[in-house]
């Protein structure tokens, strides 16, 4: 029961962090989550979870890095292979040497091998933290790709260096030749293991499909299990589990690119399932990180052997050392390449870009998990020197780098924000065209003999939307006014429906379907769409996982009586028209007429439209609606991808989500 309650508290903290971020958007979600974790763990009766490093790596790091390997563009990483290797290998080992000697010089009680171990575990940047922080600023695309590539590789190099430094501290023996050979063996073995295991897992899934086992839920479960299987197998063999899951993610991305068209439904369901899993895992990483800090700090602050201000100074000096070393490494490499290419193919080094790279080097959960894996005793049975201090210093550096990135990255990218604001309308139009094209592409890929007619009709609808966007500019003021008037009409319909119930002209049970429909429309036209996982989206996800069928809804309630439905819908639409006319003025007259025209079409369909239950039309409309919801979800995923890749900022993503919610509202209105 305690474990269950702890999980509920953690999930509640994740949800709370996103709610808080809506009110204080200038504070990044990861920092809020760390703060909430600290707050909950600070109370004696609060939540205290001991960090098991092995469990942490397999439960959190494996699926997160697997997903990063899947979604990071392979061609762009290959083009940046030289700088990525220089950061993931060269900078890591430079950090171990420079920071290690600095730590030992500053704190003589920490032996040199242990200082190297601390420097090694501080060398990897946290790809999860980098992605979370960079999404709120306009990070240049090239820098973002470089950071992603670095984050995928330097966890392994840092942990291997940490492992050998710990071994040297525990045993007192170290061989540079043996360490170098082992590093190559562990790294290459991890990559090879990830590729081979992924290949066999993919072949196994193809084999199941050839047997006719195309159940979406089963294949998604196999996908979820994949990173855990790869990581555990690689670690059992003795190679890098981290590099194995990265290689596995890249291999699965290649398989996804080649996936047959009739598996588009699986792609959509898989994408939405992983979005939820990653949302929870990302949040848990930072909340658990915050939960560890009070306990770690208490051990040091209550120990009279340590001066509190002195250990805080140690943290600041180590952080400064890491930042200076990273800046010099990036600047010198950039300047050297610029000079070597005779200033033709490489841009001149810029201070702003170098500073962005420097402060994006956030340390995170991998660092703390590695620090907690330090053994308690040496080979002779004596305590590991300054173990608690090393863990405290690691936690302090994590906090410092996280705060520095949160404060400085938005300032360094402010100029780009202003440039984007100048042509906001143009960028929104461009993004909307890209979204509609992605929906058309999804419909084409998912087309088969069974849905060909429906897919072509829907593709034509999206092409019409695309032409409309290209013809006339988007007017935000008019659009906000239209949303307000439509919301007013929906409320008038709700009031009319309630009146019919009270007058006993309609049974309340029969009116349930329309009440639900009006409620969903009200959510989409109001600010409720800001909540990322709304009821509507949850129903869509269940539908894609084949746990909910829309035809079950059609066959129940008021929709069984076609004439009754038409009469009620006509009366509510007429009430909406009357209410809108009463609130019409010179300022909103044009928009009111537009919305009234929509309601007049509804009234006309109720009076003269074709039979609602004509079998062919019903089947066609149902298939079209299902495909349309899939296309809408594809667009939502594309918005998130554009946002995470830094191609659009928060404001543009907000406008695009409003646009998609309007599309979904139209779908609900016409069903």
Curated annotation (Swiss-Prot):
Transmembrane segments: 7-29, 46-66, 83-103, 110-130, 156-176, 182-202, 228-248, 276-296, 315-335, 364-384, 389-409
Tagged with keyword Electron transport: no
Keywords, alphabetical: Cell membrane, Ion transport, Lithium, Membrane, Potassium, Potassium transport, Sodium, Sodium transport, Transmembrane, Transmembrane helix, Transport
InterPro entries: Cation/H_exchanger_CPA1, Cation/H_exchanger_CPA1_bac, Cation/H_exchanger_TM
Species the sequence originates in: Bacillus pumilus (strain SAFR-032)
GO cellular component terms, semicolon-separated: plasma membrane
Compartments reported by the entry: Cell membrane
Protein's job: Transporter involved in the efflux of sodium, potassium, lithium and rubidium.
Keyword Ubl conjugation: no
Protein origin, superkingdom: Bacteria
Gene name of the record: nhaK
Any GO MF annotation of the entry: potassium:proton antiporter activity
GO biological process terms on file: regulation of intracellular pH; sodium ion import across plasma membrane
Protein family per UniProt: Belongs to the monovalent cation:proton antiporter 1 (CPA1) transporter (TC 2.A.36) family. Nhak (TC 2.A.36.3.2) subfamily.
Protein name: Sodium, potassium, lithium and rubidium/H(+) antiporter
Stored Pfam families: Na_H_Exchanger (PF00999)
Membrane topology reported for the UniProt record: Multi-pass membrane protein
């Amino acid at each position: 029961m305690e474990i269950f309650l702890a999980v509920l508290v953690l999930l509640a903290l994740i949800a709370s962090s996103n709610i808080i971020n809506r009110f204080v958007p200038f504070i990044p979600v990861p920092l809020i989550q760390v703060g909430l974790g600290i707050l909950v763990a600070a109370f004696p009766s609060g939540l205290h979870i001991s960090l098991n490093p092995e469990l942490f790596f397999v439960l959190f790091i494996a699926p997160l890095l697997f997903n990063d390997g899947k979604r990071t563009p392979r061609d762009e990483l290959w083009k940046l292979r030289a700088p990525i290797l220089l950061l993931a290998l060269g900078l890591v080992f430079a950090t171990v040497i420079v920071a290690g000697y600095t730590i030992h010089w500053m704190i003589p009680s920490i032996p040199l091998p242990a200082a190297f171990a601390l420097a090694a575990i501080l060398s990897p940047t946290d790809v999860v933290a980098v992605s979370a922080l960079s999404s709120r600023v306009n990070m240049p695309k090239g820098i973002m790709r470089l950071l992603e590539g670095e984050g995928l590789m330097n966890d392994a190099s840092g942990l291997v260096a940490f492992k050998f430094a710990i071994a040297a501290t525990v045993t007192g023996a170290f061989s540079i030749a043996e360490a170098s050979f082992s590093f190559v063996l562990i790294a290459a073995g991890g990559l090879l293991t990830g590729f081979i295991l992924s290949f066999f897992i993919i072949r196994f899934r193809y084999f199941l499909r050839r047997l006719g086992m195309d159940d979406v839920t089963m294949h998604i479960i196999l996908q979820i299990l994949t990173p855990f299987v790869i990581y555990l197998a690689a670690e059992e063999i003795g190679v890098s589990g981290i590099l194995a899951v990265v290689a596995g993610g890249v291999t699965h991305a290649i398989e996804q690119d080649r996936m047959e068209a009739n598996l588009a439904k699986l792609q959509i369901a898989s994408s939405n399932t992983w979005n939820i899993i990653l949302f929870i895992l990302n949040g848990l990483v930072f909340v658990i990180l915050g939960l560890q800090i009070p306990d770690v700090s208490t051990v040091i602050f209550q120990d009279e052997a340590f001066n509190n201000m002195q250990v805080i100074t140690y943290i600041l000096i180590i952080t400064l050392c890491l930042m200076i070393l990273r800046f010099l490494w990036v600047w010198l490499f950039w300047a050297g390449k610029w000079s070597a290419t005779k200033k033709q193919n490489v841009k001149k080094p810029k201070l702003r870009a170098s500073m962005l790279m420097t402060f994006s080097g956030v340390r995170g959960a991998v660092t703390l998990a590695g620090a907690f894996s330090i053994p308690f005793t040496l080979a002779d049975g004596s305590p590991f020197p300054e173990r608690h201090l090393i863990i405290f210093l690691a936690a302090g550096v994590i906090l410092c780098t996280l705060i520095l990135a949160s404060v400085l990255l938005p300032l360094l990218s402010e100029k780009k924000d202003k440039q984007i604001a100048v042509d906001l309308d143009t960028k929104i139009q461009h993004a909307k065209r890209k979204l509609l094209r992605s929906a058309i592409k999804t419909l084409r890929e998912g087309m088969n003999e069974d849905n060909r007619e429906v897919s072509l009709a829907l593709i034509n609808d999206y092409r019409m939307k695309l032409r409309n966007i290209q013809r006339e500019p988007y007017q935000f003021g008019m659009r906000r006014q239209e949303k307000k008037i439509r919301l007013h009409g929906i409320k008038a319909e709700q009031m009319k429906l309630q009146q019919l119930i009270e007058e006993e002209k309609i049974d309340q049970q029969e009116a349930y379907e329309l009440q639900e429909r009006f409620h969903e429309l009200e959510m989409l036209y109001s600010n409720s769409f800001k909540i990322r996982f709304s009821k509507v989206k949850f129903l869509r996800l269940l539908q894609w996982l084949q746990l909910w069928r829309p035809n079950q809804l059609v066959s129940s309630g008021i929709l069984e009586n076609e004439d009754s439905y038409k009469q009620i819908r006509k009366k509510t639409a007429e009430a909406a028209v009357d209410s809108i006319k009463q609130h019409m003025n010179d300022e909103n007259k044009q928009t009111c007429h537009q919305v009234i025209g929509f309601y007049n079409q509804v009234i006309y369909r109720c009076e003269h439209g074709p039979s609602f239950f004509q079998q062919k039309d019903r089947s066609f409309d149902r298939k079209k609606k299902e495909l349309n919801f899939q296309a809408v979800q594809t667009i939502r995923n594309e918005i998130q991808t554009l946002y995470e890749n830094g191609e659009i900022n928060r404001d543009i993503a907000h406008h695009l989500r409003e646009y998609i919610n309007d599309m979904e509202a139209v779908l609900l209105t016409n069903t």
